[in-house]
Amino acid sequence: MSINVNEIVLHQITKSIEGDAMKLNTMLRERLLTITPEVEQMMLQLHQAYQNKSKAYAVFNENSLFAQDLNRFLEHESEFLDFSQKATALLVNELSRYPFADEGTLVLCRYNFLATDYLFIALLDSRASMLVDEQLEIHRTKYLEISQFDIAARLNLTELSLDAKSDRYLTFVKGRVGRKIGDFFMDFLGAEEGLNPQVQNQCLLQAVSDYCAQADLSKEQSQAVKKQVFEYCKGQMNVGEEIALTELSATMPTLNEQAFASFAAEQAYGLAEHIPPVRSALKTLTKFSGSGKGITLSFDAELINQRVFWDEATDSLTIQGLPPNLRDQLQRQLKGQN
């Protein structure tokens, strides 16, 4: 798959110590990067790395300075370079408020991938390494870390232009350090929470359960429908696609002469037409799982009352027919103790 880079620029953020205080500084490019095969390859790798990251959705609030500058650029009232420099200033101003503020290279790029226009923003770290030249001499060198990054956001410019009221045109990386990165990027962009994939997935699961219940399906029949739903969702996750509600409905049986999509709309679950899949939520369609107090359990839902029996009164599970490898471990270790 190819990527078409329209405009791209790099700016540098550095740190300095003034007295007892840390200060962030900027080194701004005065012109855009020339678009070369190397530049396009770098952006393709950044695009792919971003696709694989855990992301949250957001929308601009009414007072977003970033959105105002972006709109001026999109309306051709300013150039991309000018927009990028103002965005860098906003970023540094916001970043300086946080203890995790660090140096980095800021990448801003407008590109097209699969007929969709994007604006990508990321703060990349530099890594030190060694370089061997043509004379087999060793030199110190630095390279951009383009596979591992936590501070990044992307705007779907195509979706924003088609539907300004969309709640999913802006995404940002959640980050491994938790909520702080999320708050920081929300403040920098002047944004607030948009589509919540976790909530959407939970609503989808509830809709599927209710759809089966209103048709008075047996436990086995309901589980078969849920398994169909999971297989479709699993297929979408495997190819990096979202759950398409209409497409999902077409794979499910029609119950009480009403398709699932029609049922979900009628019952007002608030489901989006396209839902980002959340694996941890969807797996509950076919499995029971949990962990705590040194115990981790996971088993297929269809095994309830067949090989796995729950006694609510005694808060216990009885398992008949242990997995062979577990039984083998018990026999070897516990018999050895006796």
Swiss-Prot record:
Compartment(s) where it occurs, according to its Swiss-Prot or TrEMBL record: Cytoplasm, Nucleoid
Name this protein carries in UniProt: Nucleoid-associated protein PM1885
Domain of life, source organism: Bacteria
NCBIfam families: PRK00378.1 (NF001557)
Keywords annotated in UniProt: Cytoplasm
GO cellular component: bacterial nucleoid; cytoplasm
Pfam families named in the record: NA37
Family the entry assigns: Belongs to the YejK family.
MF term (GO), any: double-stranded DNA binding
